[in-house]
């Protein structure tokens, strides 16, 4: 029997994906959010899911209510009304923890690479067998007949603790979310607690000594480039068309693979997926076949070409992610100037990682910075400004605004890499409009 679900904060990346998945499984789905456009709403609108403005009038006792993790009674009128009336509701991660028990579940955790790896795993498995999935780019697929469920496990505020998957990949650990985690040890403890809940197999990046401290009742398989790992990527060829490599398990070759993706991090992500599916007994020939057709996930190295100008959009908002994205850009466009346009995301992260951001951005040939995008969870107390970051970058750097991105035109034969988790896409759109207007004026 179908239920009616109401999502408080339906435009959130995880929430929108879950809403789409439940909609495809035959349930009635609606939700509420702010009026501001967010990239996830396109998929919801295409599916015919109703998006309402926040209002207590949206709430009734017969609804199954799922609330986004950022919302509290003091900042959301709907949640305040739900609590006042004594209605039942679940947080996103609580609902997901219960929901996934009906499937064989495959989680992807890690400080970086979660969304890309989840997308790759879901793409391969859904093309082999009926699979439901939930990806952090706002994409979800639900099937009532699916045996498998692939999902992204978010470490922020330990939201992944309700999850008890059969299998999980852990791509890496790194210090991030300084508004919540106290340091790297706190991050490690969260991942270690999550790992203990995995039931049948853990697939962990093997070249980080800290990750070798993770313990679990489930068997642990390490993957990477070095011979000390269980699953090893070897004979790697990186070209402008992607990456080719072989994977060995216990020193025996299990297949040759190609991924149409760029950067060493994507070879590691693919190796993790291959390892997980190999241990599950999935045919490696089928895995190789479907790896070749992966087209990526939203806002992860998303490319477009406007009048011969290459523009890349990426969600990178941590120094490690910036380095990986710029490495990927250099692999695909080795003869072009790499121009980075970056919007720092949250004041707390910018303060905590200021030197690391400067080092990462200095891997580009030129850097342009947008004003810091503050989180709804914090206030700007003036401790850090984007100019502080600009002063530490060793390459040419400048500031841009949405109203004036014309300094970006001072480059020939360039690739423009827009990075950030805030509203960096507004800057990208502004640049695209500028290019379009220039073309019109020269015709």
Swiss-Prot record:
<dbReference type="GO" id="GO:0071555">
    <property type="term" value="P:cell wall organization"/>
</dbReference>
<dbReference type="InterPro" id="IPR036565">
    <property type="entry name" value="Mur-like_cat_sf"/>
</dbReference>
<keyword id="KW-0961">Cell wall biogenesis/degradation</keyword>
<protein>
    <recommendedName>
        <fullName>UDP-N-acetylmuramate--L-alanine ligase</fullName>
        <ecNumber>6.3.2.8</ecNumber>
    </recommendedName>
</protein>
<dbReference type="GO" id="GO:0051301">
    <property type="term" value="P:cell division"/>
</dbReference>
<comment type="function">
    <text>Cell wall formation.</text>
</comment>
<dbReference type="GO" id="GO:0008360">
    <property type="term" value="P:regulation of cell shape"/>
</dbReference>
<comment type="similarity">
    <text>Belongs to the MurCDEF family.</text>
</comment>
<dbReference type="InterPro" id="IPR013221">
    <property type="entry name" value="Mur_ligase_cen"/>
</dbReference>
<dbReference type="GO" id="GO:0009252">
    <property type="term" value="P:peptidoglycan biosynthetic process"/>
</dbReference>
<keyword id="KW-0133">Cell shape</keyword>
<keyword id="KW-0132">Cell division</keyword>
<dbReference type="GO" id="GO:0005524">
    <property type="term" value="F:ATP binding"/>
</dbReference>
<keyword id="KW-0436">Ligase</keyword>
<dbReference type="InterPro" id="IPR005758">
    <property type="entry name" value="UDP-N-AcMur_Ala_ligase_MurC"/>
</dbReference>
<keyword id="KW-0067">ATP-binding</keyword>
<keyword id="KW-0573">Peptidoglycan synthesis</keyword>
<dbReference type="Pfam" id="PF01225">
    <property type="entry name" value="Mur_ligase"/>
</dbReference>
<dbReference type="InterPro" id="IPR000713">
    <property type="entry name" value="Mur_ligase_N"/>
</dbReference>
<comment type="pathway">
    <text>Cell wall biogenesis; peptidoglycan biosynthesis.</text>
</comment>
<dbReference type="InterPro" id="IPR004101">
    <property type="entry name" value="Mur_ligase_C"/>
</dbReference>
<feature type="binding site">
    <location>
        <begin position="110"/>
        <end position="116"/>
    </location>
    <ligand>
        <name>ATP</name>
    </ligand>
</feature>
<dbReference type="InterPro" id="IPR050061">
    <property type="entry name" value="MurCDEF_pg_biosynth"/>
</dbReference>
<dbReference type="Pfam" id="PF08245">
    <property type="entry name" value="Mur_ligase_M"/>
</dbReference>
<keyword id="KW-0547">Nucleotide-binding</keyword>
<keyword id="KW-0963">Cytoplasm</keyword>
<dbReference type="GO" id="GO:0008763">
    <property type="term" value="F:UDP-N-acetylmuramate-L-alanine ligase activity"/>
</dbReference>
<dbReference type="Pfam" id="PF02875">
    <property type="entry name" value="Mur_ligase_C"/>
</dbReference>
<dbReference type="GO" id="GO:0005737">
    <property type="term" value="C:cytoplasm"/>
</dbReference>
<dbReference type="InterPro" id="IPR036615">
    <property type="entry name" value="Mur_ligase_C_dom_sf"/>
</dbReference>
<keyword id="KW-0131">Cell cycle</keyword>
